[in-house]
């Protein structure tokens, strides 16, 4: 009975659903929404009742179909009010069904509590017809309602996406959107990407005249026309403004008329032709100057034709008559050329004439420049006025730009490439390609050549600066007289030097020649050099810094002849006849002092503090100034000084020559003299102790004080003193031969000759010194400088360092040394006020180039240097060391 009631209930429910389905046909959407609600409730009850997995399959149907119906419902926003009314009406009909379903659930629960089989039996026949009904209803609605809106809403986005993906793919490959549209129109929107790509490749390979790419050609033509319009737009703007952009024109009427009349007749028609030519070009400011006397009637000596043209142009305010009048029957004419040039210059215009106006060009330089740049010459070909297309020459502006105030950018004058866009030369093509735009028209090779030229120019400029930094720092004494007479610089030709020295010696008295040769010169030291020991003999004391010699010239002295040892840098030794013999007993043993120091190697790092001036840095330990033909020491030369009595002069074949050479040297017995001799050197004391047989007592690490350079004997052309400090003699007095060739340094001629140094020193009176005075002067802390008239302008080193001469003993001099001595001197310049003025001027000039502190520092270290170039070189060296 219960089963029958259940079936009846289900039958009633199906009938009600069928009736509702008929309502859906009239208003499909509204009734379907009500049915959906009813089915949702009904299936919800069934889901609660059943645990069978087969029944759970009914659950996804409303869950899947509900979003679809919701989308359909969301698309109908305008019918919201009517939907609410219909749904409210349907809810009344659905209340009964809901009530019946509740009863059904209550009825179905009871049998389920009794037997499970009955629940399955009553559930299976009642659910299947309902599911069939639901599927039929959905099939009725899908083709009518849900499918048509889905096509309308969903398909267009898919088409757009496909089109966008295909378009992006083609654009990435370099094709244009127009080409993609052509291919899609040909193949359809559903074409595969491979087909589209193949068609695009075919389309790209086809010629421009193909019909399939006609639209592309039109687009290309449009773009090219736009570009041409853009390129021509400034031209058009200039043409529009050409009347304002054109320069004023001033015509020399007399010159034009006579040129048209073949220099025989004043043809006014020529003026008319010239004016018309400029008017046709758009010129508005045209002025023609003609002398007023041309208004007179024609005469045999002054033929004039077409005078009415002058009247007409005057009425048009184009022609202007320059004043002229008659005074006592004579014509007084103003210079019309001056009117022409003046007006053209003031109005910044153009002069039309075949005259050069040389007389006016010489009056004012601005007129000369204006005439050179603004003169337009012309020619008449029958009755045609023809100015040149290049008024200022082949490389000048064109005629159009010449007549404009602001010239137009010149068009490319290169020949267009015959291959056009098919040219495969690229940037190497020498022809003009308009599609390149602003790219350089020169080939790559030309660009590289231009870059290499610029780089070479830069390196050349930088090279000059580098050379200036490497200029050796040298201390040289130049007087104002040397600056005035332009002393010769360092020369490599010995013959030139010989003539110079001969001229100087002719002017100097014989009494002073030896003294001139005894004046020591200074040696330039390179700013940066690597100091290497040049002798294997170890020094007992620390080598002073400041002397550097590169190793390239480290050759034994024996390779050179005795009289050519120091002149090998110049090629030719000086003749012996130039050097007169000296009879001074002092000089006999002078170069014997060299033997004492022949084993020393001059090396050590350079220190800027060790560079001293001419008066303060008198080196005695490198007294290698020779009266022979040695050249002065070159910068960085490491040729060694040689004890002449040991090696060079022993091999002299001529005894008289040897005697004359020995007169410039000291006695060979004084091989080594004391360390104080190196430190505290004085002329008479040198003579005394140069004959001493005492071995020196060394003070190894004692710093060398400033030395007075009163006794150094460079020969004519010899330079002996090095600007650095010099080492002490070695402890052994007999180590001479093995190191003679490498010990001391040969010198080369410097930029200042000995005679010049002599001229720069004051002509003082030489004072004789006796042996006792010489011995007594050792104890004087003032060094005996006052005896020479030398006033000390700077402080000597600290006296805290005890002198080294206290332990020195002196032997008696030979009898031949008893006569008084003439002591050479190189001291202060001749005129101290002028000397200071020059120094001040040099200081001011150098301060304009270098930092004042640096200039002051270098000038303090070189107190007697008056050569601005040498000071600048020293400043550059100091600047590089201090890291300015």
UniProtKB/Swiss-Prot annotation:
Ranges annotated as C3H1-type zinc finger: 411-436
> Which cofactor is recorded for it?
Mg(2+)
**Region described as Disordered:** 66-108, 456-548, 716-739, 755-776
Positions with biased composition (Basic and acidic residues): 500-516
Which of the residues bear the PTM Phosphoserine? Answer: 231
Q: What induces it?
A: By bacterial lipopolysaccharides (LPS) in macrophage cell line RAW 264.7.
Q: In which domain of life is the source organism classified? A: Eukaryota
An annotated Gene Ontology molecular function: endonuclease activity
Give start-end positions of Low complexity composition bias: 87-96
* Domain RNase NYN span(s) in chain numbering: 246-401
What InterPro entries is this protein classified in?
Rege-1_UBA-like, Regnase_1/ZC3H12_C, RNase_Zc3h12_NYN, ZC3H12/N4BP1_RNase_Reg, Znf_CCCH
Listed EC numbers: 3.1.-.-
Q: Which Gene3D superfamilies match?
A: 3.40.50.11980
Please state what class of enzyme this protein is.
hydrolase
Keywords, in A-Z order: Endonuclease, Hydrolase, Magnesium, Metal-binding, Nuclease, Phosphoprotein, Zinc, Zinc-finger
Question: Biased composition, Polar residues: where in the chain?
Answer: 456-478, 518-543
Which PANTHER family does this chain map to?
N4BP1-RELATED (PTHR12876), RIBONUCLEASE ZC3H12C-RELATED (PTHR12876:SF36)
Give a short account of what the protein does: May function as RNase and regulate the levels of target RNA species.
Q: Which family does it belong to?
A: Belongs to the ZC3H12 family.
Query: What name does this protein carry?
Result: Probable ribonuclease ZC3H12C
